[in-house]
């Protein structure tokens, strides 16, 4: 669950695989700024095919009498966020920290090479899978470098999540 959306575990019945479905909060689904940000997250993340970035499979909106709610279907990651691991275990070894950061940097380098800047990298947006793989997630406020219209970010606006 994030600021503008909720994430649910689901099954893609057609392909028989576990997925995560990120749904915009219903109260925000009528706000054009949030709709654009959500759409941009889906488009940006879908452009990125990297082992350390959560994959996006599909996007759409629910047919709803009370108004459509946008969603993103993505890879379901079994594991914990880096934030949760640090809170539960405290300090980690230099070797583990370096391995995690190396994979995060690889993912960010890949996204930057694709022209997409994450802009909210933090321990809560890094998952460590049950097998030890690293997955960067939540490109919700990412910006494509080619997007010269920074209409989504106003001058002097704060970007990211307050920690």
Briefly describe each language-model feature range.
Residues 25-47:
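AlphaC helix of the eukaryotic protein kinase fold
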Residues 11-18:
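Conserved N-lobe loop of protein kinases adjacent to the ATP-binding glycine-rich P-loop
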Residues 104-116:
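Protein kinase catalytic-loop region centered on the HRD/HxD motif
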Residues 6:
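Conserved N-lobe ATP-binding subsite of Hanks-type protein kinase domains
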Residues 66-81, 85:
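Conserved short submotifs of the Hanks-type protein kinase catalytic core
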Residues 59-62:
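Activation-segment/catalytic-loop signature of the eukaryotic protein kinase fold
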Residues 100-101:
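Activation segment signature within eukaryotic-like protein kinase domains
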Residues 30-33, 68, 129-163:
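Activation segment of protein kinases
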């Amino acid at each position: 669950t994030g600021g503008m959306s909720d994430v649910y575990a689901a099954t893609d019945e057609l392909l028989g695989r576990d997925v995560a479905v990120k749904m915009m909060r219903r109260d925000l689904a009528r706000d054009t700024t949030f709709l654009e940000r959500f759409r941009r997250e889906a488009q940006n993340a879908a452009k990125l095919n990297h082992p350390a970035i959560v994959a996006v499979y599909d996007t759409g909106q629910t047919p709803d009498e009370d108004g459509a709610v946008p969603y993103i279907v993505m890879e379901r990651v079994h594991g914990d966020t880096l934030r949760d691991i640090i809170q539960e275990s405290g300090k980690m070894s230099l070797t583990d920290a370096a391995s995690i950061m190396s994979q995060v940097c690889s993912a960010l380098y890949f996204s930057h090479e694709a022209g997409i800047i994450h802009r909210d990298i933090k321990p809560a947006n890094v998952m460590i899978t049950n097998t030890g793989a690293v997955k960067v997630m939540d490109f919700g406020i990412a910006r494509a470098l080619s997007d010269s219209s920074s209409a989504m970010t106003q001058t002097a606006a704060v970007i990211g999540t307050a920690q």
